[in-house]
């Protein structure tokens, strides 16, 4: 998949997630954290001109923070939001994980 198409798809999937979570917000701190995560990555994706490792690291960071909030946080996602998250999750594993390059020593925990 070419860079521009990948950026467009990532932006669309995160936008879909953003729209879906608007219907299940409860005003909890985790809702605010998730919204902040989404806003940050949408801003980064919008200004990105090419797919480089810095953007891949941003996408990975977004994925890790959001995954933690959804898995262990107090978020109550409806079916639409859960489906939107699963769609992004699949995209992330198919297109981001294997392309991301980490530098320096990496230790498994």
Where are these regions (language model features)?
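Non-transmembrane alpha-helical oligomerization segments
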Residues: 17, 27, 59, 92-95
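Short terminal alpha-helical segments
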Residues: 1-39, 100-109
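Amphipathic alpha-helical interaction modules
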Residues: 21-72
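Amphipathic alpha-helical binding modules
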Residues: 64-109
């Amino acid at each position: 998949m070419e860079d521009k198409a990948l950026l467009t798809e990532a932006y669309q999937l995160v936008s879909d997630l953003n729209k879906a979570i608007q219907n299940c917000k409860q005003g909890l701190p985790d809702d605010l954290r998730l919204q902040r995560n989404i806003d940050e990555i949408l801003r980064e994706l919008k200004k990105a001109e090419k797919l480089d490792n810095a953007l891949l690291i941003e996408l990975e960071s977004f994925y890790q923070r959001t995954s933690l909030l959804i898995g262990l946080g107090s978020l109550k996602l409806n079916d639409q939001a859960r489906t939107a998250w699963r769609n992004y999750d699949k995209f992330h594993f198919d297109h981001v994980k294997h392309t991301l390059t980490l530098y320096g020593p990496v230790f498994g925990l």
